Amino acid sequence: GIKYSKFEIPPEIIKMWRSIGIKGQKQKKIWNDKLQKSPPSVKKEFKDQIEKFIHPSVFAKLNELKADLREEPQSIATRKASEICLKYINDATAITLGGSADLTGSNNTKTDNINPVSAEAYGRYIHYGIREHAMGAIMNGISLHGGFIPYGGTFLIFSDYCRPAIRLAALMQQQVIYVLTHDSIGLGEDGPTHQPIEQLSSLRAIPNVSVFRPGSAVETVECWELALENKTGPSLLALSRQNLNEFRQSLDLESKYNPCKNGAYCVASNSKKPEFSIFASGSEVNIVIEAYQELSRLNREVSVYSVPCLDYFNSQDNDFRENIISNASCNIVVEAGVSQGWDRILRENGIFIGMSTFGASGPYKDLYKNFNITKERIIDVILNSK
């Protein structure tokens, strides 16, 4: 048995432990001396990299992309828009370190301008394997070390496996970015095992986690911009598998202005004081806009708000929120998930159109119809409201 008393460390173990520290001290001195002898430009570059400084030129490139997407709108999945955005980001800076939990082809996380990490060569992309929690834990370590902003991809449904790592990133205020694709019943035939229902709500419930769910290509660029700016916690991008129409081409906003930073903003309105305000995120914004167009023809007074980040909206000052929430007689929320978390907007007389059961297998358009998340449902609710 052990011959030592409680909390007594054997001398040989102490010696071994301290020898590791002494070796580390020597290596640290060698490294610091080398850095001090380096040219000022090298020292600045190293300091900027360690502190994860993003040069303004990166955001300028994103503004160029945003302007292009507004001028030539595309109907694409937001996961594809994210890939386009990442190519611009990975081209403009060496600070990003990507990866995926064996879903690279589906998450669209690897761009052609970065190479995988290997034993033989430096790279900026990690194939984590089917290990979502390990991916999250490794990204936390990368962020804590400094020098890189890690981003990793998986399906939104598998965020449950990442949850402890996401929570720790939030607790430690670490900048870690998750690319969570296949974000609703819109993923289609993979069925209820892969269709997230409660995930958006449960992730939003974690303090200091920013959940972004863009509804178009332009919003995807803006959400990536906010994720890069968010230095004090994890950012999660929930992205669609199905194509979504662009709705920002006709909105009179300067290309440099990012309305997503407010969490919610008006994308369509036919009245300063409408009967109904409809709030939606992600793919459901397209559905709501279709309903709005029909309701306008029927002379119903309606405003439509895109809510790309409910967390950001809830963090705005009370006056800002009240001006939006209290503007209409009744608020309607449309999201292909559960209603939890939308209470501040719904209030007592609000109407929620979304999910309360597991999904099903089938073409995504059939599923939206089956679960009654359609423009017809929205129109019917408004026309039949007292």
What is the role of each PLM region?
Residues 1-131, 141, 277, 281-283, ...:
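Conserved acidic/glycine
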Residues 1-8, 12, 97, 104-200, 220, 222, ...:
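Thiamine diphosphate
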Residues 79-88, 161-165, 221-225, 316-320:
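Short alpha-helical segments and helix-capping/turn motifs at coil-helix boundaries
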Residues 1-17, 170-175, 183, 207-210:
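Mobile "lid/hinge" segments at catalytic clefts and subdomain interfaces of large enzymes
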Residues 92-96, 120-124, 145-149, 172-177, ...:
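Short coil/turn connectors at secondary-structure junctions
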Residues 97-100, 128, 151-152, 178-180, ...:
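General beta-strand structural signal in soluble alpha/beta enzymes
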